[in-house]
């Protein structure tokens, strides 16, 4: 093989985030296809792709060179930033490069992102090779300006600190000033004896990727492509050129090519991957292994005392627990993981001791008895047949991995504790990368290409919003996408470009739960990435790479449900303390509570963890779970595999006796499998059951059985053939017929693909059960906690308020005196609306109000509140929102008076503050002591009409709390529906039609699997609700009426809804209230007395009627005198459309009782 002549030493991948298009894998693959012996990836101030690059490089026979590009501040050049490429020559250089990158982030960003000071290179110079940055480097900038003195100063610095390790970088990519700089640099090199090196400053794989790269950069920088102000810093020539192309390009400077190979030879970094380094856990004089044994045995004693309070029972059950504990401890210690268990034990115990709610454990870790004994998990693995080997397999060495759920509010306290315990330099969270996803990339590309918003929005909306959606999947799921792609060239160009950018790394963030704890400093293992202020460090390696690099990951996950349970318990235990009852321990509630299972079987699971979706409610209704094992099964069954395979139907039929029980199949079963499969009615539902079947039938160890389970999941033919023979041979040794064994093996293999981790299912089922139990026994406290957790999502709060009303719970409007930021329950058991859920108020103003209330007691009225709170925090807009929401209802006569008095109250408060500032007591100070007098200072005005009050509630709370818009229509609606309210509806006889009316509270159009469209809307008349279905013809005709907050009158057939257990209507005819009036009303009656009539009133009456004269309803004026009553019929040209606007105008003018519609 001939000696290489060129190596690429400056290449950006998409991890550069500001530019760079290709991922590390394709870059390595391209270099390999070009026959390159080595490659450097030098992303901008990061090594995010290093682990992947290192593995891919060695896999492809390419030497990976570790490096990074930097923005450098050199005080000689003022505030100007220059470029520099830094390569690691050896492991010391790699360590120094890591520190250089970390330091750049830790000091905070400049306008151009993270920056290094040139002087930092002095302390971290060992093992580093520098490329000058070409025309954008400090020497390059000085050369182009002809500032020889500065050139000399810059070069002297590098000669002094980096002799033979500083190279003048030469680039020929057709960009401005490159050749001018290149000739000056070559002259400088000859004059000073400096080496030169050629790079192509690579940003993409092929030349025709240039346009996609320009768009990628424009997306980051916020420009459109044709914006004349857009910087044009790149050229189509910055692709990965071949050795031949580079040799031709630099044929006049062969030394620049030779030096690329020499540098590649000098760069020899070994990155240690695949080893684990745990921090040392303090164990005093004991070894870590002995300390673990001691703590586990002590913990088991406590657990057994709780599980079996009866001493005889405990004595009887102890041996199986002792045996299992000894086996697990032996495996943990042999595999070298005692420290891991102790570290997790410590921070979980600290959390519990410091009031941080912790989940019962999730994932396969719940299968460990040692974890249960150490109180890492809260499920007895023996009771629920959970297997340790599913978590830690002695036959397959891999790190244990506990996923620990913490209360969202307090999770950061635990991370702070860990940082305090092991050292802040040793603890970090983990980076995660955002990529250009299907929907967003269409919007981004469309914007950069300059397309109108509507055009881009139409295409983007065709991409389903499902997680993990890709453009390829979207083209399969949405038939309109391929249609418009083929029909419209602009659409095709946009989507083709979006495909090139889809999946490209866009930004970096913080992983939801991953935390690493290093035995020394984090930077000994990975560089750090920080936010713009240099805070919140995360490792630059993602969660899989950071483990491969040797750091052990701990998952500190935030689970909202734990926060809900904690809030509910705080309210419950406050009430119990008042009643002299002991606090409720949620971990000690019985798992067989009848009230809870009755509620579950009725599918009343809104707000219950994991069980609140429509599909899950349907499954619950069919399954009718009546024990905790059924709840574990629910979590495992509600997944696409079991639902689509028919497994769910078999499970339900077997539970209810409609299908014969067999273990696992009527034709092929064995009695020894009954104990394994009995909890799931003979269905192979869990991965643990797959392992137990292999153990029972064929004598597998549980470690070996776990390997079998994995092999079945991967479906590798050669591995499966090997496992089949092992399974058959083992079964024969156990005296089981070989054919039967193979048939059962086939069944196990079939179901293994659907099998779920029972440990995870059981742990989540426990949290589900706890929320179910709280909803059944403490409904007000539980629902108040749930609404608090969803305060920022008004739509969710609206649904939860509906659920409260369905449950018969009373919800009071927010109250400035008794209310809190959160929803809470008062002494009467009523839920008081959280002030924090009022839209447009914010936390600062609420804190100011509550502080003032805590200091001076309840507010007496609006003037008192304004005087006692900081009006800088509590401005007029916020006060208006509070009045509209009802929060001030107890402070004044009515909301209109409060609103009209607001200006005076704020003015008085301002005067009061000024007087206090100069130490005076003014008239307001006296008035504040006399509420009766203040009452008189409210503006004199009429109360708002009910609709205005309700609109204010809707605007600020997202719902109607003290009334309902339909109230004003009830009398009228009775005419259309024959007096039948929704709660009184019954299924209609075949062919018969009935009429229903109500306010639309939800409306949507969905597409069935067959591609048919169905409209669904929910009507509410305050007495009840009805779901209305509109199929194809009806939907085409009436879809424009399916709008939230519209009053609809619907005729159709009513039938039972198997899903909800209620009723549903299939619509034939739909009208809104205006159409219904036009159809059914016979006149508009206006009643006036002789005392009311004058020219002014008649003129205003004419003005009110004028805009509505294009209708069909005659107007009748009833004139009332003491001695007579007359009816005047307006002429045909005065027929009107009786809209809400007209009726409200007339009622405001004459009076509500004097305007009404007439019917036959």
UniProtKB/Swiss-Prot annotation:
Gene3D superfamilies: 1.10.150.870, Bacterial DNA polymerase III alpha subunit, thumb domain, Metal-dependent hydrolases, Nucleic acid-binding proteins
E.C. designation(s): 2.7.7.7
Chain's role: DNA polymerase III is a complex, multichain enzyme responsible for most of the replicative synthesis in bacteria. This DNA polymerase also exhibits 3' to 5' exonuclease activity. The alpha chain is the DNA polymerase.
SUPFAM superfamilies: PHP domain-like
Keyword Phosphoprotein: no
Quaternary structure, from the entry: The DNA polymerase holoenzyme is a complex that contains 10 different types of subunits. These subunits are organized into 3 functionally essential subassemblies: the pol III core, the beta sliding clamp processivity factor and the clamp-loading complex. The pol III core (subunits alpha,epsilon and theta) contains the polymerase and the 3'-5' exonuclease proofreading activities. The polymerase is tethered to the template via the sliding clamp processivity factor.
Highest taxon above the source species: Bacteria
Any GO BP annotation: DNA replication
Cellular component aspect of the GO annotation: cytoplasm
Family the UniProt entry places it in: Belongs to the DNA polymerase type-C family. DnaE subfamily.
Organism for this UniProt entry: Salmonella typhimurium (strain LT2 / SGSC1412 / ATCC 700720)
Swiss-Prot/TrEMBL catalytic activity: DNA(n) + a 2'-deoxyribonucleoside 5'-triphosphate = DNA(n+1) + diphosphate
Keywords, alphabetical: Cytoplasm, DNA replication, DNA-directed DNA polymerase, Nucleotidyltransferase, Transferase
Record's keyword annotation contains Transferase: yes
A Pfam match: tRNA_anti-codon
Gene Ontology MF terms: 3'-5' exonuclease activity; DNA-directed DNA polymerase activity; nucleic acid binding
CDD domains the record matches: DnaE_OBF, PHP_PolIIIA_DnaE1
Localization per Swiss-Prot or TrEMBL: Cytoplasm
Protein name: DNA polymerase III subunit alpha
């Amino acid at each position: 093989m001939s000696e290489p002549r060129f190596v690429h030493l400056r290449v950006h991948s998409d991890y550069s985030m500001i530019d760079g298009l290709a991922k590390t894998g394709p870059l390595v693959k391209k270099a390999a296809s070009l026959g390159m012996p080595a490659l450097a990836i030098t992303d901008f101030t990061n090594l995010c792709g290093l682990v992947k690059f290192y593995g891919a490089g060695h896999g492809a026979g390419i030497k990976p060179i570790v490096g990074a590009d930097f923005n450098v501040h050199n005080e000689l050049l003022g505030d100007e930033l220059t470029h520099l490429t830094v390569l690691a020559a050896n492991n010391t250089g790699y360590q120094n490069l890591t520190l250089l990158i970390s330091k750049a982030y830790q000091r905070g960003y400049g306008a151009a992102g993270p920056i290094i000071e040139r002087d930092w290179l002095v302390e971290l110079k060992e093992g580093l090779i520098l490329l000058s940055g070409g025309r954008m480097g400090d020497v390059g900038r000085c050369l182009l300006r002809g500032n020889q003195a500065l050139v000399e100063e810059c070069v002297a610095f590098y000669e002094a600190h980096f002799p033979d390790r500083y190279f003048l970088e030469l680039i020929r990519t057709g960009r401005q000033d490159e050749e001018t700089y290149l000739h000056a640099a070559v002259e400088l090199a000859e004059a000073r004896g400096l080496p030169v090196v050629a790079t192509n400053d690579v940003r993409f794989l092929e030349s025709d990727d240039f346009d996609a790269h320009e768009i990628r950069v424009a997306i980051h920088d916020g420009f459109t492509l044709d914006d004349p102000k857009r910087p044009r810093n790149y050229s189509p020539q910055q692709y990965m050129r071949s050795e031949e192309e580079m040799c031709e390009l630099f044929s006049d400077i062969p030394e620049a090519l030779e030096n690329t190979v020499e540098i590649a030879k000098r760069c020899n970094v070994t990155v240690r991957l695949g080893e684990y380094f745990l921090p040392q856990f303090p164990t005093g004089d004991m070894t870590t292994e002995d300390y673990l044994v001691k703590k586990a045995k002590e913990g088991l004693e406590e657990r057994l005392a709780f599980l079996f309070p009866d001493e005889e029972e405990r004595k009887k059950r102890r041996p199986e627990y002792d045996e299992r504990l000894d086996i697990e401890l032996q495996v943990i210690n042999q595999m070298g993981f005692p420290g891991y268990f102790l570290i997790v034990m410590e921070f979980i115990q600290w959390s519990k001791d410091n009031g941080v709610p912790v989940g019962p454990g999730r994932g396969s870790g719940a299968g460990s008895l040692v974890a249960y004994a150490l109180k890492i998990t809260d499920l007895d693995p023996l009771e629920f047949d959970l297997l340790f080997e599913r978590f830690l397999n002695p036959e397959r060495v891999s790190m244990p991995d506990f996923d620990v759920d913490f209360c969202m509010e307090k999770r950061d306290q635990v991370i702070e504790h860990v940082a305090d315990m092991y050292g802040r330099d040793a603890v970090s969270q983990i980076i995660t990368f955002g990529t250009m996803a299907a929907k967003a990339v269409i919007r981004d590309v469309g914007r950069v290409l300059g397309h109108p918003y509507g055009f881009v929005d139409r295409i983007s909306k065709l991409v389903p919003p499902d997680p993990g959606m890709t453009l390829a999947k979207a083209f399969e799921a949405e038939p309109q996408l391929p249609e418009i792609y083929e029909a419209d060239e602009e659409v095709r160009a946009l989507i083709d470009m979006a495909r090139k950018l889809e999946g490209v790394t866009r930004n970096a963030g913080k992983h939801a739960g991953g935390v690493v704890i290093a035995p020394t400093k984090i930077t000994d293992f990975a560089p750090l990435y920080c936010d713009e202020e240099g805070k919140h460090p995360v490792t630059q390696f993602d969660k899989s790479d950071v483990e491969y690099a040797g750091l052990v990951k701990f998952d500190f996950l935030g689970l909202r449900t734990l926060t809900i349970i904690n809030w509910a318990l705080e309210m419950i235990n406050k009430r119990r303390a008042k009643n002299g009852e002991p606090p409720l321990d949620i971990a000690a509630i019985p798992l067989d509570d009848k009230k809870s299972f009755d509620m579950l079987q009725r599918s009343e699971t809104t707000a219950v963890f994991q069980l609140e979706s429509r599909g899950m409610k349907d499954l619950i209704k069919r399954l009718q779970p009546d024990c905790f094992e059924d709840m574990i099964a629910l979590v495992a069954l509600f997944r696409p595999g079991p639902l689509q395979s028919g497994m769910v139907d078999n499970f339900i039929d077997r539970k209810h006796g409609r299908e014969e029980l067999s273990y696992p199949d009527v034709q092929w079963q064995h009695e020894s499998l009954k104990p394994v499969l009995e909890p799931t009615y003979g269905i192979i539902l869990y991965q643990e059951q797959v392992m137990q079947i292999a153990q029972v039938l064929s004598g597998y160890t549980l470690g070996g059985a776990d390997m079998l389970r994995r092999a079945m999941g991967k479906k590798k033919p050669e591995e499966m053939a090997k496992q089949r023979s092992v399974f058959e041979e083992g079964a024969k040794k156990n005296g089981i017929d070989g054919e039967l064994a193979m048939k059962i093996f086939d069944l196990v293999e079939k179901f293994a693909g659907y099998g779920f981790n029972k440990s995870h299912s059981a742990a989540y089922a426990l949290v589900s059960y706890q929320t179910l139990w709280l909803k059944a026994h403490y409904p007000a406290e539980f629902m108040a906690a749930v609404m608090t957790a969803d305060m920022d999502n008004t739509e969710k709060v609206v649904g939860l308020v509906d659920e409260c009303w369905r449950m018969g719970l009373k919800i009071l409007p927010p109250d400035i005196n008794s209310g809190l930021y959160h929803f809470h329950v008062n002494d009467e058991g009523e839920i008081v609306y959280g002030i924090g859920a009022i839209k447009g108020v914010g936390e600062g103003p609420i804190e100011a109000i509550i502080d003032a209330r805590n200091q001076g007691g309840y507010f007496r009225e609006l003037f008192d509140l304004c005087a006692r709170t900081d009006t800088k925090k509590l401005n007029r807009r916020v006060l208006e929102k509070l009045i509209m929401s009802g929060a001030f209802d107890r402070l004044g006569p009515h909301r209109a008076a409060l609103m009209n008095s607001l200006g005076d109250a704020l003015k008085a408060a301002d005067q009061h503050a000024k007087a206090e500032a100069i130490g005076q007591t003014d008239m307001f100070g006296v008035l504040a002591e006399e509420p009766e007098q203040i009452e008189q200072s409210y503006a004199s005005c009429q109360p708002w009409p009910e609709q205005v009050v309700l609109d204010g509630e809707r605007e600020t709370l997202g719902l109607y709390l003290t009334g309902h818009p339909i109230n004003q229509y009830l009398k009228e609606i009775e005419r259309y529906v024959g007096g039948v309210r929704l709660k009184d509806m019954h299924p209609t006889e075949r062919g018969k039609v009935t009429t229903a009316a109500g306010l639309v509270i939800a409306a949507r159009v969905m597409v069935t699997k067959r591609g048919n469209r169905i409209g669904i809307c929910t009507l509410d008349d305050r007495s009840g609700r009805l779901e209305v279905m509109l199929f194809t013809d009806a939907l085409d005709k009436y879809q424009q009426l399916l709008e939230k907050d519209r009053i609809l009158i619907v005729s159709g057939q009513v039938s039972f809804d198997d899903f909800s257990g209620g009723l549903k209507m299939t619509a034939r005819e739909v009208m809104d209230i205006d159409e219904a009036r036009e159809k059914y009303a016979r006149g508009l009656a206006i009643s006036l007395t002789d005392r009311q009539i004058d020219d002014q009133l008649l003129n205003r009456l004419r003005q009110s009627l004028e805009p509505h004269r294009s209708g069909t309803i005659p107007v009748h004026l009833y004139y009332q005198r003491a001695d007579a009553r007359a009816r005047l019929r307006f002429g045909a040209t005065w027929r009107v459309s009786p809209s809400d606007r007209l009726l409200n105008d007339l009622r405001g003018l004459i009076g509500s009782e004097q305007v009404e519609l007439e019917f036959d």
